[in-house]
């Protein structure tokens, strides 16, 4: 299993790619994608940047050609024939590093572009148009909420305040998770999905340069 990460300042993108150890079903690969998105969101938070576009690429396993596959065929980097990969983008309503918003965008895009019948071998997810939190907030004229703002909820509209409150809660959780991982290791705290069968985060965290430590 290989894990590829990149932070491209010139193209303003942050992404990761994973080569699965074996062919995964659509649902099983979706679990891995959730883990990858969680890691991507934490990476955005750590770098203090936001994105307004999620890009997803899914490559299918060559074994699919032995079934009754009738779709387009392409060639992988090893010269093998494989079903044409699935690729798509999803724009967010505004610049964000919100796990909820990015997860929703990534999973809806996955459901839209992936053929559920085909087995999957590679996943790539990228956050595009990366800008600093400061620039993002300037662009969307975002103002940090204070306790006074919460008390004056009736003046701003309860729904708007609830959204801001959720954002603050999520950022606090991200900060706590990041601090724990830095202090005790990436496997010190794991999300529930990473304990399910087929999840790969724990194994990838145990690896250094693609090999187990």
Model-predicted segments: where are they?
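Basic, low-complexity intrinsically disordered segments
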Residues: 1-213
